[in-house]
């Protein structure tokens, strides 16, 4: 059956179109800097928000109207697969992502859970044979079930550690079977509420042991996808061990795991950590650890993970600025880890939301490309740090200066003069480039 019978394929119609079911800026075939938009952006649909989210929150029950909700159990799981590939085709997206429990219900035993997963993976595999949409990444849900109340790999209960390992083992087998580009680890319960009852050293050691086991098993079965860690500072756990990129990077370096992992950066998680989206992307990029992106945005007035669809053009531009400087995302992509608002409960809202996000990143791509092509910020930055290309600055950079030499130099200095950072000027330039790309020429006349 058709789950979205009144919606056709979403096509590019240009910025002057008033068709709500059309892309205004995302043209998958348009080339930007030698690559098509589709190749640059590598969009992905998040299975959990799009097909299992029901709109419930701590103050209200689910209210989403979904054509597949008349089913239950495995029939519901199968209907969601059918609806998913219909939406993928109509949006023309190249990728999707899922947790294990998104695609199939848990059974009474682990064996039953495996059986359910195998049946749905069979179905997904068949759909993928005739679909352009591939698996960007999958992961194991190690946070929802009560067994994970104290964590998974960091649980105080070794039985839980073993159960979590079994779920990831199965997840890696599914990843290999479906040709996943990546496999993600997000430690929603890997952290602590209070140090009064926590052996932090043991928990971190065990988390590292868990990751090493995953690396070993991936090698054993021949899964060559990229491993990704998704940092988040809190929620649901008060203090999570993968707080931000810098914290998670220190963990990977400490335990000899850096060569096996990169980061999946989520915009809203950066917000919760007190960072900008572009900050987390920059830290990952300069350390060679930028792997993939969960494309969403948070509400700056709220203190939790709101997972809104990305429509902030400054954020998408500065994100693409980092991604382009990274040479792209390689095997990663832009996954819409985003949900429609509770008040946007009709099926067509799923399309409006993805169109908005895809158009927003298309604008960001084009603006970022022009900024880099014109070297707008690079020229200013080079001039700002020019003192390190000559004289004493060059000696500092080349490692030929020491405290004795620097003291002698400083004693001969007169009054030190700095130059302006020109922040307001740079923001004006950013606005100018944004308007030139995003506002149709007729509207500017």
UniProtKB/Swiss-Prot annotation:
Domain of life: Bacteria
Entry EC no(s): 5.3.1.5
Example of a GO biological process term: D-xylose metabolic process
Gene Ontology molecular function terms on file: magnesium ion binding; xylose isomerase activity
Cofactor dependence: Mg(2+)
Active site, renumbered: 99, 102
Reaction catalysed by this enzyme: alpha-D-xylose = alpha-D-xylulofuranose
Residues annotated for Mg(2+) 1 binding in this entry: 230, 266, 294, 337
UniProtKB keywords: Carbohydrate metabolism, Cytoplasm, Isomerase, Magnesium, Metal-binding, Xylose metabolism
Annotated Gene Ontology cellular component terms: cytoplasm
Cellular compartments annotated: Cytoplasm
Classification via PROSITE patterns: XYLOSE_ISOMERASE
Residues that hold Mg(2+) 2 according to the record: 266, 269, 305, 307
Note describing how the cofactor binds: Binds 2 magnesium ions per subunit.
Cited NCBIfam families: PRK05474.1, xylose_isom_A
Family indicated by similarity: Belongs to the xylose isomerase family.
Quaternary structure and interacting proteins, as annotated: Homotetramer.
Protein name: Xylose isomerase
Organism: Geobacillus thermodenitrificans (strain NG80-2)
Lineage, uppermost ranks: Bacteria, Bacillati, Bacillota, Bacilli, Bacillales
